[in-house]
Amino acid sequence: MYFDQSELLPADILVGRNEAPDASKARGIRSVLGSWSNHNALIVRSAEHGGYAVGDTTPPRAMVVSLHHYEDLVNAGTYKVRIYRVRDLSMDERLRISLKWYELSYGRHYSDYTLLQLALFRFVNHLPFRLPIRGTWCSENTVRPFTAILPDDRNPIRKPDPPFLLKKNVTPRTYANRLECGILEDVTERTNRNDK
């Protein structure tokens, strides 16, 4: 598998599923959340990586990794990747969100959350405040630049109906729910190629 960079756009959302034999935490995340995926990241512009790269939040800190990093994981058979796209964003908004990731998300300390905390997120997911957690996690750090650039009624973590309240404790399940209600579009068939 390789990413077709002509089909990727800045601010696309990478949705990952770690299936490595030693990925017990990833399996736990999926199980607790009832989610296909256990990881989220943002497609960002990167001159260093020749076009696009992945704004990735993993221990110990958020960093930029090449698309090849995820291609290698998929091709080794230990990872699955889907690409979700926020509907109705202009290219200017996409570029601003991509740049804002560097400003707001890059270098942030990864959270030391536990599966118990994730279970709490799932079952009290309508809390009107963010649960107190040191650091940030991948899903939260992925949406941070969207929240800075877009009004609430266009934010990908908004509830689908007015008054478009934002989800305060974002998890991989949040992105799956927004896909189901049409806020996000799955563009994997266009972006992920196997014909090399």
Annotate each predicted stretch with a short phrase.
Residues N75-K80, M91-R122:
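A structural motif
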Residues P10-D12:
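Loop/turn positions that initiate beta-strands
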Residues L118-K196:
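Activation targets extended, charge/polar-rich intrinsically disordered C-terminal tails
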Residues V15-L89, H126-L127:
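Glycine-rich catalytic cores of cysteine/serine-nucleophile enzymes that process amide/ester linkages
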Residues A41, Y102-E103, T142:
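Residue-level preference for non-acidic, small/hydrophobic
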Residues Y2-E7, V32:
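Short, surface-exposed secondary-structure edge patches
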